[in-house]
């Protein structure tokens, strides 16, 4: 007799726990979980009691967070698109990234920061769009104010980013606050850096009122910038991430290399050096770079020499459809023809050892 669908949901958390390593932020798996709020809250493995309480109490916020997971993972993949580790996700793994983030590396620091930022962004946006019962536009942005251009009236809908930060801190940090180990402190630091990054790009937008746009009266509001700005900023922080060690009393960090400055609240921190990600490695969670597309003319991280780790590359000849011979027609359209373009695609060779192909 076939088990009912509800029975499958009851077994799913236990099955995922058996099959995948424990990674702190199991709420990342909310991207792949559909159905009612009860199904989502009770069947995402690894949530602590505080997270489940918030999940049951605010199902609309959880839906926003779930949609936000897809956005910040896409941003992570954009930032790492030219690197050996490309922020690839594992759809059937409740940790979303597998074992790779078990290491306290730069990559872990970035993922925790961008995920925390993504929660702030998703909740704040949902507040402004009227999708959440617990918040709306920023209630503090009312009345008259002044800036370098003079007096203006607060109007429109200012993004309520303080609410987004408050909820993100309560939900995302809940599991880390239960632990007192070094990794929990690292995650909390990078989570906070991610939240602060979103607020950094809050900008004032204004609309002029008056005869012929004379701007005798201005109405202004605060709006978040596109999430790409946050991603670009955290990418720079990733490249300048600071390696740290725990201090003697185990309550904070000190720099691993005394020549470097102490990390600020905006910096990303990490404990362990990253693997090279060249070959498939179960323990490191690395998928390797065999089969990855590389750039023959680049001298950067996406070059065939760097991406392929010196193993060489294969070249295939492919054709693709592109737009060509585009012309502007008055008024107001651009019309193009479809053309076939021939090009060479270079992909990294596999290691000579056969064990690279064993699935993780």
Swiss-Prot record:
Keyword Cell wall biogenesis/degradation: no
Residue pairs linked by disulfide bridges in the UniProt entry: 76-87, 127-135, 137-157, 206-220, 208-215, 278-309, 294-304, 308-348, 324-339, 326-336, 331-332
Record-level GO BP terms: canonical Wnt signaling pathway; cell fate commitment; cell proliferation in midbrain; cell-cell signaling; cellular response to transforming growth factor beta stimulus; mammary gland epithelium development; midbrain dopaminergic neuron differentiation; positive regulation of fibroblast proliferation
Gene Ontology CC: one annotated term: extracellular space
Superkingdom of origin: Eukaryota
UniProt name for this protein: Protein Wnt-2
Lipidation positions, renumbered (O-palmitoleoyl serine): 212
Assigned keywords, A-Z: Developmental protein, Disulfide bond, Extracellular matrix, Glycoprotein, Lipoprotein, Secreted, Signal, Wnt signaling pathway
Family label: Belongs to the Wnt family.
Subcellular location: Secreted, Extracellular space, Extracellular matrix; Secreted
